From Swiss-Prot:
An MF annotation (GO) of this entry: metalloaminopeptidase activity
Residues that, per the record, bind Mg(2+): 287, 364, 366
HAMAP family: Cytosol_peptidase_M17
Assigned EC number: 3.4.11.1, 3.4.13.23, 3.4.11.5
Cofactor note: Binds two metal ions per subunit. Two metal binding sites with different affinities are located in the enzyme active site and can be occupied in vitro by different metals: site 1 is occupied by Zn(2+), Mn(2+), Mg(2+) or Co(2+), while the tight binding site 2 can be occupied by only Zn(2+) or Co(2+). One Zn(2+) ion is tightly bound to site 2 and essential for enzyme activity in vivo, while site 1 can be occupied by different metals to give different enzymatic activities. Mn(2+) is required for Cys-Gly hydrolysis activity.
Superkingdom of source: Eukaryota
Modified residues (N6-acetyllysine): 221, 455, 489
Protein name: Cytosol aminopeptidase
A GO biological-process term: proteolysis
EC class name: hydrolase
Record organism: Rattus norvegicus
Length: 519
């Protein structure tokens, strides 16, 4: 028995009743637990018909050509990212979802700055796995589609949804590789995607749950389970005071939640004293704006203002799982930015760890204040590279939207490494200027050495980067402003609506490539 794709009304009924109800006459309950996702390419000029992937062609032969037959009579050829579901073709797979992969020849697109073929696979596999999830099947086998890592990323990222606090949850679907393809690449893709999903979970969690202390505990648990080559230091307020991090403390003092300075070490190099890479992440677990309070509309999204800390810590957890032969240190100043009688006031002057004084003209420009001290501290490790990530400015969202992470760097070498990694992952970056033009706007300050706002309203992302540069002496430093990529509405088809966890996979890929270059 085999069935055509169901019309909309029938699909609704199917989801209400459960797919098992269709099979009382044929398959046992044990057979009802597995779906299959297979790929098909768009027709090239030399093709008579659209071509299946290798796995798709093998399955079509297994069912005596019926999959091709059903595709031919069920509608027009599948476009990239579109799906079509068939039922009853094979007893091992009650539901088979065919997904459109676009052109087989798709590769690196120099205009889009990504690998189009890999992106097509991620989007198509995600769509197919969600179809299986909607049918309430607990497992799915996935065609590697010519790139098992991209397929795994599409499956794991596409199936993830934050429902930790809901009583009614979606069916948890276990995805595994179909056939005897490249299992190593598949597992690598699962690892990359799981790293991004950890960042998504941290960013999506409500601020009353994901406090600075709780954030540090979650990372400690994940890091210690990832590798024995790790250390976690959860620094308290007294340590922060000893380090004379006055800029960080000035933000934290407005909240009842105690601040935490999270310091994580992964020592993967055979030489434990080898200079590390240092990642720094902004960790504002809720940003009300402080005395310069934000508008209430969408303020709830500011639970994810610790996205920088979430992405850099998740990337280091993933690097530890990969057992990369390098040393990495992660630093995350964690606190809330709240209004109170103790909070920073516009016009206050605070002193950073390096002795520079800062005039705080807007308390909602707090991310740069906590990063200033963390960047100063990063230099004490004599690192090879310093990279910080932060949901820093609304101006970056205005400039690039969700299309790419903005990168400000004083090193073309470092820019090229980040860019190459982003092309591979599809989570893109775009270089932004670090001109002295912007530096002059933040050092033109009435009361202190530097102002936490630019002199003018224009180029807010650039003046924020210029501010951070005042606390950096290292010649290989990059600032990633991830404000524009913090959330996903519908722009990235393999991510559901919500917090994106970007650019975690690009950071993991950067670390992987750096480790290969070092060895």
């Amino acid at each position: 028995m085999y069935l055509l794709p169901l019309p909309a009304a029938a699909r609704v009924a199917l989801r209400r009743l459960g797919v098992r109800g269709l099979w009382d006459r044929g398959l046992s309950t044990a057979d009802m637990t597995k779906g299959l996702v297979l790929g098909i390419y768009s027709k090239d000029k030399d093709d008579d018909v659209p071509q299946f992937t290798s796995a798709g062609e093998n399955f079509n032969k297994l069912v005596s050509g019926r999959l091709r037959e059903m595709l031919n009579i069920s509608g027009p050829p599948l476009k990239a990212g579109k799906t079509r579901t068939f039922y009853g073709l094979h007893q091992d797979f009650p539901s088979v979802v065919v997904v459109g992969l676009g052109k087989r020849s798709a590769g690196v697109d120099d205009q889009e700055n990504w690998h189009e073929g890999k992106e097509n696979i991620r989007a198509a596999v995600a769509a197919g796995c969600r179809q299986v999830q909607d049918l309430e099947l607990p497992s799915v086998e996935v065609d590697p589609c010519g790139d098992a890592q991209a397929a795994a990323e599409g499956a794991v990222l596409g199936l993830y949804e934050y429902d930790d606090l809901k009583q009614k949850k979606k069916v948890a679907v276990s995805a595994k590789l179909h056939g005897s393809g490249d299992l190593e690449a598949w597992e690598k893709g699962v690892l990359f995607a799981s790293g991004q999903n950890l960042a998504r979970q941290l960013m999506e969690s409500p601020a009353n749950e994901m406090t600075p202390t709780r954030f540090a505990e979650v990372i400690e648990k994940n890091l210690k389970s990832a590798s024995s080559k790790t250390e976690v230091h959860i620094r308290t307020k007294s340590w922060i005071e000893e380090q004379e991090m006055g800029s960080f403390l000035s933000v934290a003092k407005g909240s009842e939640e105690p601040p935490v300075f999270l310091e994580i070490h992964y020592t993967g190099s055979p030489n434990a004293t080898e200079a590390p890479l240092v990642f720094v992440g902004k960790g504002i677990t809720f940003d009300s704006g402080g005395i310069s309070i934000k508008a209430s509309a969408n303020m709830d999204l500011m639970r994810a203002d610790m996205g920088g800390a979430a992405t850099i810590c998740s990337a280091i957890v993933s690097a530890a799982k990969l057992n990369l032969p390098i040393n990495i240190i992660g630093l995350a100043p964690l606190c809330e930015n709240m209004p109170s009688g103790k909070a920073n006031k516009p016009g206050d002057v605070v002193r950073a760890r390096n002795g520079k004084t800062i005039q705080v003209d807007n308390t909602d420009a707090e991310g740069r204040l906590i990063l200033a001290d963390a960047l100063c501290y990063a230099h004490t490790f004599n690192p090879k590279v310093i990279i910080n990530a932060a949901t820093l400015t609304g101006a970056m969202d205005v400039a690039l939207g969700s299309g790419a992470t903005g990168v400000f760097t004083n090193s073309s070498w470092l820019w090229n490494k980040l860019f190459e990694a982003s092309v591979e992952t599809g989570d893109r970056v775009w270089r932004m200027p670090l001109f002295e033009h912007y530096t002059r706007q933040v050092i033109d300050c009435q009361l202190a050495d530097v102002n936490n706002l630019g002199k003018y309203r224009s180029a807010g992302a650039c003046t924020a980067a210029a501010f951070l540069r005042e606390f950096v002496t290292h010649t290989k430093w990059a600032h990633l402003d991830i404000a524009g990529v913090m959330t996903n509405k519908d722009e990235i088809p393999y991510l559901r609506k919500g917090m994106s966890g970007r650019p975690t996979r690009t950071l993991i890929e950067f670390l992987l490539r750096f480790s290969k270059d070092s060895s």
